[in-house]
Design a protein with these regions (language model features):
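A generic structural signal for tightly packed, nonpolar segments enriched in small/aliphatic residues
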Residues: 73-80, 84-86, 223-506
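Glycine-/small-residue-enriched capping loops at alpha/beta junctions
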Residues: 2-278, 480, 487, 502-505
């Protein structure tokens, strides 16, 4: 009996010891999450070698190299770094303050505007190099990443902030990727750096909204997220429910939305940066939070990506937040129709016809192409109520401004034709005035032609961002993640609004 008691006592002691060791292991396993230590890293640039000349460090890179007694130059020579754009190495324990140093190629020194590519290569090279370096240091668990300007502080901020961002919401806290804190290194141009962070954070906001799973980003949740993001910035957000939509007779939008149990919502957003009586720039963003294709269901393999059909609305939220943060001196009004497209007994059927606010009829011939239907009546309503000076949903002036903005931000635009030829491609019918379907594959041009018929004589631009604001699958930019939502073209529109507000660039 005594031996049995001793055995039980021994088992309890072993069990307690095991549990204590297990707790100790768990504490060690989670120690990194609880640790408050700061790990610093720095990104410096190196220009590509030309001919027999060896790679040359940027001015800030040379200062840092002098600080560490030429160690960086020696390491560049030993590792064979060529300064090729986006190629680099991370060196550890070179400096007492910075645990890791990322040396990244910035491409050719003195790169400027490329007329053939329609892009400012110097600015884009800074984005790429800063983004590659910041992400490399993020993978080394650097909590604070210092990035040199590479002669373009604003663009370096954009590239690094876009590169280190992650959509982590649905991962366990201990498994989430560290989002490094970014600081400008060795440059007095802090204003440009902050502008770049504002623009990148606005695009990251659009990326988060678009990348969130559809069940976590319904029209109602999107509306609440918009209120949370914009109202603290002094932006007015009005949330319009089904009753309001019906009272305004926005029938084309309701036809698209009625197949889902999720109630549709329209957001009216107003940013006032100048005199209230000044006419606003009107923005419309398609906010289909999930597009199943309705009765014409899309293939199952690609259904998930169609949560990104609200990328236009997400970009609108992002660049209005940036406009407020940058205090742009102009008035902006945005209308965001939010809904889901689902198959059900209430869903729109091929061949349905609606009467628009202008008295014309529009046939819903192809239910898988619902964007035109969702935007038609809201576009007519917004023009009537707000009487804008410009509608961004084609004048030469507007395109030239977008072309310039795209060249400066690295997110370029390409003007598509708006010829009468495409109007003739719209399927003719004796029973309605127009339709959302046309002959041939030029669906972007056909959609623009249909919407163009609804716009009176004001400056107008239709941005088709299909497969641009959604998943990045082919040749992604180095500072964006593959197979994730891009948030494009948020920064281009922010730059466009800046050009409209400040024509002299000040």
């Amino acid at each position: 009996m005594k031996s049995v008691r001793l055995m039980h006592a021994l088992c309890r002691r072993v069990q307690h010891t095991f549990l204590a060791r297990r707790r100790d292991v768990e504490q060690r396993r989670h120690y990194a999450e609880k640790c408050d230590s700061v790990i610093k890293g720095v990104v410096v640039g190196v220009y590509a070698k030309e001919g027999d000349r060896q790679p040359k460090m940027t001015p800030s890179g040379e200062k840092f190299d002098d600080r560490v007694q030429g160690k960086i130059t020696d390491l560049i020579r030993e590792t064979g770094l060529s300064g090729q754009l986006g190629k680099g190495r991370v060196f550890m324990n070179v400096d007492a303050e910075f645990r890791a140093v990322a040396v990244v190629g910035v491409g050719q020194e003195g790169a400027g505007f490329n007329d053939l590519e329609m892009i400012d290569e110097g600015m884009e090279n800074a984005r790429v190099a800063a983004g590659v370096g910041a992400r490399a240091l993020q993978l080394q668990c650097c909590t604070d990443v210092f990035v040199e300007s590479m002669e373009y502080a604003e663009q370096a901020a954009e590239g690094s902030a876009l590169a280190v961002w992650r959509y982590n919401t649905n991962k366990r806290r201990r498994d989430r990727t560290l989002i490094s804190k970014l600081e400008l290194y060795d440059s007095p141009d802090s204003d440009a750096w902050m502008r770049g962070l504002f623009k990148a954070e606005s695009q990251n906001l659009a990326r988060r909204l678009a990348d969130t799973p559809a069940n976590q980003m319904t029209p109602t949740i999107f509306a609440q997220s918009t209120v949370d993001a914009l109202c603290p910035c002094g932006v007015s957000v009005e949330v319009r429910s089904m009753d309001w939509i019906e009272s305004k007779s926005l029938i084309s939008f309701l036809m698209v939305a009625k197949g889902s149990c999720e109630p549709p919502i329209i957001l009216e957003i107003a940013y006032c940066g100048t005199a209230p009586e000044d006419k606003p720039i009107l923005l419309l963003g398609k906010g289909i939070t999930f597009n199943s294709g309705g009765l014409c269901l899309r293939p199952k393999d690609c259904l998930s990506m169609y949560r990104g059909c609200m990328s236009g609305a997400a970009a609108c939220v992002g660049f209005i937040r940036a406009a407020a943060g940058l205090s742009l001196p102009l008035n902006i009004t945005a209308l965001l129709p939010l809904c889901e497209i689902m198959p059900s007994g209430m869903a729109a059927k091929p061949g349905d016809v609606v009467s628009l606010l202008n008295g014309k009829t529009l046939g819903f011939v192809d239910v898988s192409k619902a964007g035109v239907m969702a935007m038609a009546d809201p576009l007519l309503y917004a023009q009537t109520i707000y009487k804008p000076r410009m509608v961004v949903d084609n004048s030469n002036f507007v395109y030239k401004q977008f072309e310039k903005a795209g060249a400066l931000t690295g997110d370029r635009v390409w003007r598509l034709p708006l010829w009468r030829y495409f109007k003739e491609l719209i399927m003719p019918n004796d029973t309605f005035d127009s339709s959302n379907r046309g002959r041939g594959p030029a669906s972007s041009c056909i959609a623009a032609v249909v919407l163009h018929e609804l716009v009176p004589c004001v400056d107008w631009a239709h941005l088709d961002i299909r497969n641009v604001g959604m998943l990045t699958r082919y040749n992604p930019l180095p500072y964006l993640l593959k197979d994730r939502m891009t948030g494009r073209p948020t920064r281009t529109i922010v730059q466009f609004l800046f050009q409209m507000a400040c024509p002299d660039g000040k």
